Amino acid sequence: MALPQFPYLSQHEWRYFDDANHDPALAASDSLAYQDSFIRWLPHLQGDQPQGLVHFYSIDRPTVLLGAKDSRLPNLAAGLAYLEEQGFDYALRPHGGLGVVCDPDILNIGLASDLTHFPLSIDAAYEQMVALIGLSLIPYGLELEAYEIAQSYCPGTYDLVVGGQKIGGIAQRRFKTGLTTAAYISVAGDQAARAQLMAGFYQAAGADDSYPQVDPAVMTTLAHACGQPLDRQSYQEELIQLISHYQKLVPGDYQDPDLVPIFNKMRQVSLARTQSLKSEVNSTQDS
């Protein structure tokens, strides 16, 4: 298959980080701390071309990554207690306004770059991720579209849609000249159950009409859409191969002396974000 030009990929030197290989038991809050860290670490990187990072941070423990708007739900403690009853952990993420589900069949990927060397508008940054995921679906005979699926969880203008159903979503974060565009892809598993979980969460938390009215029928998985067995790891390998077509990928070093102190600081920030949620539940139980 002849691939189109992709300047964003071809004009960066990419380092890739895979949290599952680094530490399979890594907490969700630590994966989010790495997201915060990479966007701050980028200015320390030097090379012949602009530097970019590919971050795989899939989370095996059933977890809901909540957004800033979720933290303002009127009965948040009841919603969090509901998630715990369903066997789900939770964390508060630094980007995206609403919650998404993580489990062993969900792939999370982030692309981080420095706007000083490769300027991108907000829309253009989203479009880079749409283009990458779209190219990855061509071998499956699938055409990717990007538009809002209002009755999905975490709906947004750049929802990833196949055959009218959402298979993933994208969020974006900027810090000074750093940019991270992150996507989740529902590769396989029970997407209806994920949607029902989020519908139950919003109901328990007393959400009004400004929050998603989640309908499981509007979402699906990549495996279901292509009609063949597929797992997260194999799809991740396909993404790695696709990016490698445009530019060599070099394994990143989690122990880089410039990265470690940044991560240690951001880890405390991430833990504090999530602890603020857990305090909601504890204070309700104590009252």
Protein language model regions, located:
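N-terminal lobe of the biotin/lipoate ligase/transferase fold
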Residues: 1-119
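Local beta-strand/beta-hairpin segments that build beta-sheet-rich folds
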Residues: 17, 167-168, 218, 222
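Short amphipathic alpha-helical segments
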Residues: 30, 34, 75, 121-132, ...
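Contiguous, small/hydrophobic- and glycine-enriched helical/loop subdomains that border
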Residues: 107-150
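Long, positively charged amphipathic alpha-helical accessory segments at protein N-termini or as interdomain linkers
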Residues: 140-142, 177-287
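Beta-rich nucleic-acid/ligand-interaction surfaces
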Residues: 146-167
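Aromatic/basic-lined ligand-recognition segments
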Residues: 164-172, 180
